Amino acid sequence: CCLAGAVASLTLPPFGVVPLIALLSWPALIIANAATMRRAALAGGLTGFGWFLASVWWISLSLVTGDSNYWPLLPLPLIGIPLILASFWVPAAALAHRLGRSTGARLGWLLLFLALCEWARGHVATGFPWNAPGYLFSANLPLLQSASLVGLYGLTLLALAAGLAPAFW
C-alpha cells in the first residue's frame, strides 16, 4: 500500500505521469476487502503515508541547508509531516469499510470519504492543501480550467475516481 501510494504520487508535478493514479486501485481493493475495519484503516494510512512521503520529502531539506547542526532533526519533518497528512486518509478508509456492505459499496464510500478528507486536510485542521490528488491536472491546461467550476476538491474527486476506476472493474 505504501509503495502504491508513493508511486501514484508521481502523477503530481513536476513528474505528471497521470496514468500512475490507477495504482491507487490496488490499495483501494485491499481496503474494500479487508477483514476488519482496523486493517482497512491501516491500509488507508499506509497508502496516504506513501503518497505524502514521496511528495513532501523535500520540505525536510530546509533543515539542512546552511547549518549542519540540524541534521539530527531531519527525520522529524521527513517522517512526521507525511504521518500527519496521511492521518486524514485513515478515517476515510475506516468509514468506507464500516458503511459499505459489498466491495463496490466500500469503493464508492472510499471515493467519497477520501475527497472529503482531502477537503478537511486543506481547510479544517492543517490548512495544508498541497499535493491533493486534484493537482495531477496541472499538466493539462484545458482540464485544469475546470477548476474554475468545481475547484481543487472537485478535481480531487475526479482524480480519485480515475484512480479507483480499475478497482470497480
Go through the PLM ranges and name each one.
Residues 1-169:
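Membrane-embedded alpha-helical bundles of multi-pass enzymes
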